[in-house]
């Protein structure tokens, strides 16, 4: 039985800078919080427990990265350079680039190689305070390769101190072998891939890219119905490049989240509010593709729709691994406030995964998953650009990352 009191810390237990405790303590037993509050109020029963003094550092819940494509083969830096030189995305795609190049690299990689590439990205996220993450498939686009991606995601969760939730995104793009046969491919997604992967226990949720360059409303609904048959929650890449009406469909199916949302309208916002669907904003992708259409943050505020922030870590449109950087981008590009972005990477991000009861806040009975920050103010988490701020990451009461480890 391991018992520890983490003391002399500034505590932000709910991801809300308005609700903090100065000179706080957290009592942890067997990986779970049994008490938290001001040091001066520490109950006598914990007084003799071993102490870890954090020297007045800020402590927040472990960060939650709720939308990533972390597992993939290769990278697309050369295409990035081509775009900067004036080559269009369409021209790159005709040359065999774009998402097809990532599909090709992912299909070619064996599990060990895919694991090694993805582990490096996960290690970078852990070092910046992440204790829970969602990882999507969607760069395999056939049963064997989608299975491989999801198996690697599961292995990452088993071998690293980060909780991994998997999402099947077979309906991400049309693979070359199904060119001009989108309906046939959706048949394969719904009747071939999803049943097999769900039966193997590799899928926690199902996603679809509903967009003019992705899949139609009717095709997206077929994927959602297939997910329902397997008892799996759904989410959607929606309204990123146009207002295709995907958000209303996602809300009708009680989606955990709708993500991107640059072209979301008020009707879609109202539908999300009624359904309890979280808005996941992805400032890295907005920045990287030089989008100019801002997501309707003010409408989301007005309707009280929870807003999460995520890296969208992927090789094509957001090669990012830093949630604090996304916090900065969300404040500067999307005009969000510090409290909004802090909630966006903690409690609201957990809600976007359907895991608000286990992640994103610190409370008695919860796992002791938290990040320790070398800052004077929580605003610094969104203020500094490229500066390492996370001193320590604790998962289940154990230190799993220490920036100045000796």
Swiss-Prot record:
Q: What is this protein called?
A: Imidazolonepropionase
Name what cofactor the protein needs. Answer: Zn(2+); Fe(3+)
List ligand-binding residues for 4-imidazolone-5-propanoate: 76, 139, 172, 240, 317
Tell me the domain of life.
Answer: Bacteria
Name the job this protein performs.
Catalyzes the hydrolytic cleavage of the carbon-nitrogen bond in imidazolone-5-propanoate to yield N-formimidoyl-L-glutamate. It is the third step in the universal histidine degradation pathway.
Catalytic activity reads: 4-imidazolone-5-propanoate + H2O = N-formimidoyl-L-glutamate
Which residues are noted in the entry as Zn(2+)-binding? 67, 69, 237, 312
User: Which residues are involved in binding N-formimidoyl-L-glutamate?
Assistant: 139, 314, 316
Q: Which UniProt keywords apply?
A: Cytoplasm, Histidine metabolism, Hydrolase, Iron, Metal-binding, Zinc
State the free-text cofactor note: Binds 1 zinc or iron ion per subunit.
Q: What class of enzyme is it?
A: hydrolase
Which Enzyme Commission numbers does its entry carry?
3.5.2.7
Q: Which HAMAP family match?
A: HutI
* Database matches in CDD domains: Imidazolone-5PH (cd01296)
GO terms assigned for molecular function: imidazolonepropionase activity; iron ion binding; zinc ion binding
Q: Which gene encodes it?
A: hutI
Give a Gene Ontology cellular component term annotated to this protein.
Answer: cytoplasm
Family listed? Belongs to the metallo-dependent hydrolases superfamily. HutI family.
Any idea which positions bind Fe(3+)? 67, 69, 237, 312
**Where is this protein found?**
Cytoplasm
Pfam families referenced in this protein's UniProt entry, alphabetically? Amidohydro_1
Q: Which GO terms describe its biological process?
A: L-histidine catabolic process to glutamate and formamide; L-histidine catabolic process to glutamate and formate
């Amino acid at each position: 039985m391991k018992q520890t009191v983490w003391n002399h810390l500034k505590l932000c237990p709910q991801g809300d800078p308005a609700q903090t405790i100065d000179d706080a303590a957290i009592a942890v037993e067997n990986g779970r919080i049994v008490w938290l509050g001001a040091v001066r109020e520490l109950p006598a029963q914990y007084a003799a427990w071993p102490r870890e003094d954090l020297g007045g550092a800020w402590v927040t819940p472990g960060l939650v990265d709720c939308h990533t494509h972390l597992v993939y083969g290769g990278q697309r830096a050369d295409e990035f350079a081509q775009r900067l030189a004036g080559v269009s995305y369409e021209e790159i795609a005709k040359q065999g680039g774009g998402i097809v190049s990532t599909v090709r690299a992912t299909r070619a990689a064996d599990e060990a190689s895919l694991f090694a590439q993805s582990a490096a990205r996960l290690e970078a996220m852990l070092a910046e305070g992440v204790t829970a993450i969602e990882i999507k498939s969607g760069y395999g686009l056939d049963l064997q390769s989608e299975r491989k991606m999801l198996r690697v995601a599961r292995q990452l969760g088993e071998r690293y101190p980060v909780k991994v939730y998997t999402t099947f995104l077979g309906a991400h793009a049309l693979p070359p072998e199904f060119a001009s046969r989108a309906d046939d491919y959706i048949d394969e997604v719904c009747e071939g891939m999803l049943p097999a992967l769900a039966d193997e226990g590799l899928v926690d949720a199902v996603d679809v890219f509903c967009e003019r360059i992705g899949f139609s409303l009717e095709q997206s609904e077929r994927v959602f119905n297939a997910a329902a048959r397997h008892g799996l929650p759904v989410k959607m890449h929606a309204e990123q490049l146009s207002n295709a009406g995907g958000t209303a469909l996602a809300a009708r199916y009680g989606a955990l989240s709708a993500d991107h949302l640059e072209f979301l309208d008020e009707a879609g916002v109202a539908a999300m509010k009624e359904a309890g669907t979280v808005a996941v904003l992805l400032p890295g992708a907005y920045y990287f593709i030089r989008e100019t259409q801002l997501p309707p943050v003010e409408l989301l505020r007005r309707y009280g729709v929870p807003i999460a922030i995520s890296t969208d870590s992927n090789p094509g449109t957001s090669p990012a691994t830093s949630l604090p950087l996304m916090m900065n981008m969300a404040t500067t590009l999307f005009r969000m406030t510090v409290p909004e972005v802090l909630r966006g990477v903690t409690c609201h991000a957990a809600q976007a995964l359907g895991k608000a009861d286990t992640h994103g806040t610190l409370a008695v009975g919860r796992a002791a998953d938290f990040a320790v920050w070398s800052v004077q103010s929580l605003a610094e988490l969104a203020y500094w650009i490229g500066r390492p701020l996370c001193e320590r990451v604790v998962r289940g009461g154990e230190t799993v990352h220490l920036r100045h480890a000796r």
